[in-house]
């Protein structure tokens, strides 16, 4: 990937009086992604060029062979060598972090929420096998990241929409926690767990993963005062 484009000067917004470069708005940080690709058919929005998942491809036991086709070698040195040079160059002035996944979002997106939900009942072992494979891939990535000079790790795994999580706490503990815990236990740096949506119904379970902070506290889904009162003494709220 190209070298990060750092803080280009922007004109001041006449309405807000800001440039978009203020510390509160655009903190000095650089992200490097170490996430597995979706095993899915992808589409592109012509209006903005964004990619999105059209449909997941992990829908049966036969489809497990797609892991070998889609997932790159997590131990290949090329994944880390250039990043190490960038870290050395920028870390004195910027907070440098690595973005990973614990395996939950990869499972949801690569199966599709509809197939995921059906298979929890029709073939629960398939759901667990898919999550395990994604999580084991991330474990190997994290083992390399631990040796690098990152300031912290960012685990990006959406588990909910604005109304509720996509699984209840009992389902999360059976189908997801064992594999996400594999990754969490491997992390040797401070780390943040990210998920949009309403996490309240499963948050007690999620916190057992041992993250240092949670993000983003979506205002339309979670009341920050309630969150602070109940959990502020247990985890940093970012």
Where does each model-flagged region fall?
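Active-site loop segments of alpha/beta catalytic cores
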Residues: 45-238
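N-terminal accessory beta-strand-rich subdomains and adjacent acidic, glycine-rich linkers
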Residues: 1-44, 49, 55
């Amino acid at each position: 990937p190209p070298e990060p484009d750092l803080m280009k000067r922007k004109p001041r917004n006449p309405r807000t009086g800001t440039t978009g470069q203020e510390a509160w708005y655009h903190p000095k940080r650089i992200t490097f992604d170490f996430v597995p690709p979706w095993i899915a058919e992808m589409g592109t929005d012509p209006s903005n060029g964004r990619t999105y998942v059209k449909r997941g491809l992990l829908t049966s036991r036969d489809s497990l062979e797609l892991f070998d086709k889609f997932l790159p070698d997590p131990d290949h040195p090329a994944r880390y060598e250039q990043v190490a040079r960038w870290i050395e160059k920028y870390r004195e002035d910027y907070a440098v972090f690595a973005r990973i996944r614990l395996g939950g979002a990869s499972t949801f997106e690569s199966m599709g929420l509809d197939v995921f939900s059906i298979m929890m009942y029709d073939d629960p072992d398939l759901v667990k096998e898919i999550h395990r494979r994604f999580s084991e891939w991330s474990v190997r990535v994290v083992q390399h990241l631990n040796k690098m000079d990152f300031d912290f790790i960012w685990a990006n795994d959406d588990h909910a929409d604005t109304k509720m999580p996509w699984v209840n706490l009992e389902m999360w503990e059976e189908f997801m926690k064992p594999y996400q815990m594999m990754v969490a236990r491997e992390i040797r740096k401070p780390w943040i767990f990210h998920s949009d949506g309403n996490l309240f119904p499963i948050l007690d379970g999620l916190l057992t993963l041992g993250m240092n902070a949670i993000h983003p506290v979506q205002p339309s889904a979670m009341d920050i005062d309630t969150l602070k009162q109940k959990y502020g003494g247990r985890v940093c709220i970012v």
